[in-house]
């Protein structure tokens, strides 16, 4: 399935480029790289030339670059959960 802005919340995030735009932890703002792993509450971002960074989803706003080149901002609170569980969840966007 092609990743689009409409289905990003229901899709696997591993392999996408992401940057932390806003965070409750100021030291995490600006972390950019590929998403290497995803757990229920965290994502692991591989920083080029640096260590892997584990980030709590609920505490950040991410700028995610889609394979077609589009970039979108995603509140990490909507990403909390495993990808297979996010498929079942209904998201009300007002």
UniProtKB/Swiss-Prot annotation:
Origin: domain of life:
Archaea
Task: Tell me the keywords, alphabetical order.
Answer: Cytoplasm, Endonuclease, Hydrolase, Nuclease, tRNA processing
Q: Which SMART domains match?
A: POP4
Which cellular component, as a GO term, is one annotated location?
cytoplasm
Q: Where in the cell is it found?
A: Cytoplasm
Q: Which GO terms describe its biological process?
A: tRNA 5'-leader removal
Extract the signal peptide range: none
Q: Which Pfam families match?
A: RNase_P-MRP_p29
Coiled-coil residue spans = none
Q: What are the EC numbers?
A: 3.1.26.5
Reactions catalysed, semicolon-separated, are: Endonucleolytic cleavage of RNA, removing 5'-extranucleotides from tRNA precursor
What GO MF annotations does this protein's record show? Answer: ribonuclease P activity; RNA binding
Q: How does it assemble?
A: Consists of a catalytic RNA component and at least 4-5 protein subunits.
Q: Which HAMAP family match?
A: RNase_P_1
What the protein does comes down to: Part of ribonuclease P, a protein complex that generates mature tRNA molecules by cleaving their 5'-ends.
Question: What family name appears in the similarity comment?
Answer: Belongs to the eukaryotic/archaeal RNase P protein component 1 family.
Supply the name of the protein: Ribonuclease P protein component 1
Q: Which gene encodes it?
A: rnp1
